[in-house]
Amino acid sequence: MAEIDDVLQALLSSTGASRVTLRQDLPGDYAFPVTHEALAAGVRSLKEERTVDLRTQPVALEMAAGRQVVQDDSARAYDDPAFHRMRETYGGLAAQIVTPVLADGRTVAIVSLHQLGSPRRWTEDEIEACTAAAARVGQLL
């Protein structure tokens, strides 16, 4: 859907981050696959990545509870070894804002804004932009 791609690209452009993904709760063997993404130059796609089991990731558990996660320094966020393997698999994930898309109180999709390489301090405007992007995606789904 081109409108969803436009929302993700606008979020990427306004923040100067590395990657924005939309994961949707779809039928199948892999929980919340990436269905749409916007990438900065040279950043690897996650659309075909299937080695990370999101059902056990601490951030995914927060999404299931309907809570946004803001990490300025993902390396310090959790002690969980699987989380740190995911960070490396995702290209050196250093900071992120992860926002649930809710419908009838249930998480139906997830918008993730990733910064690769080095931590970064997210601004209130960037956090609000993620919230607004997730709300807009929810309207489009």
Question: Which ranges hold each PLM region?
Answer:
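Soluble sensory domains of the PAS superfamily and closely related sensory modules
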Residues: 60-69, 76-79
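Sensory-domain boundary capping and coupling elements
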Residues: 101-115
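GAF sensory/regulatory domain recognition
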Residues: 9, 21-51, 56
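Short coil/loop residues immediately preceding or within conserved phosphate-binding loops
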Residues: 17, 96, 108
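Signal-transducing coupling segments at domain and membrane junctions
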Residues: 74-95
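Regulatory loop-to-helix N-cap segments in sensory/regulatory domains
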Residues: 115-133, 140-141
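Amphipathic alpha-helical coiled-coil segments that mediate homodimerization
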Residues: 1-22, 133
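A short, aliphatic-rich beta-strand micro-motif
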Residues: 94-102
